[in-house]
Amino acid sequence: MHFMKRKHPCRIRKRADFLAVRTGEKRRGPLFLLEVKSREQTAGIKSPLVARVGFTVTRKNGNAVKRNRIKRRLREAVRVGLTDDIEAGTDYVIVAHSDALHAPFTFLISELSRRIKPKTKHQKRQQGNMNGI
């Protein structure tokens, strides 16, 4: 039986691109911080409109083996669960927390898909009302 491979999204690899995304919107979650920035907002970068994803795992998450495992899990979660949800012309940087190493893979995918989708005005208003209580 032949299984169709899903295409990996483009990766962010340059420091300047990571720093540019840091100025964008931040969406916090229990397993990671997702930084999102539209490339139209980033001046001077001329590239085809494809979605790009970068991964950051800091040294406080453990030794190199643990950090690499977290990155592999996140890369696979993006490939399997999010290739249809990510917006073309947008850069995403996932800053992992140490909990991403031991979280169930299905939970990792569901958290990523929840954070990737932009909030509507109605959801933002509801969240604002909850913070005021």
From Swiss-Prot:
Q: Which reaction does it catalyse?
A: Endonucleolytic cleavage of RNA, removing 5'-extranucleotides from tRNA precursor
Q: Which UniProt keywords apply?
A: Endonuclease, Hydrolase, Nuclease, RNA-binding, tRNA processing
UniProt keyword annotation of Nuclease present? yes
Which InterPro entries is this protein grouped with?
Ribosomal_Su5_D2-typ_SF, Ribsml_uS5_D2-typ_fold_subgr, RNase_P, RNase_P_CS
Which family does the record claim for this protein?
Belongs to the RnpA family.
In UniProt terms, what function does this protein have? RNaseP catalyzes the removal of the 5'-leader sequence from pre-tRNA to produce the mature 5'-terminus. It can also cleave other RNA substrates such as 4.5S RNA. The protein component plays an auxiliary but essential role in vivo by binding to the 5'-leader sequence and broadening the substrate specificity of the ribozyme.
Q: How does it assemble?
A: Consists of a catalytic RNA component (M1 or rnpB) and a protein subunit.
Extract the HAMAP family matched here.
RNase_P
Q: What is this protein called?
A: Ribonuclease P protein component
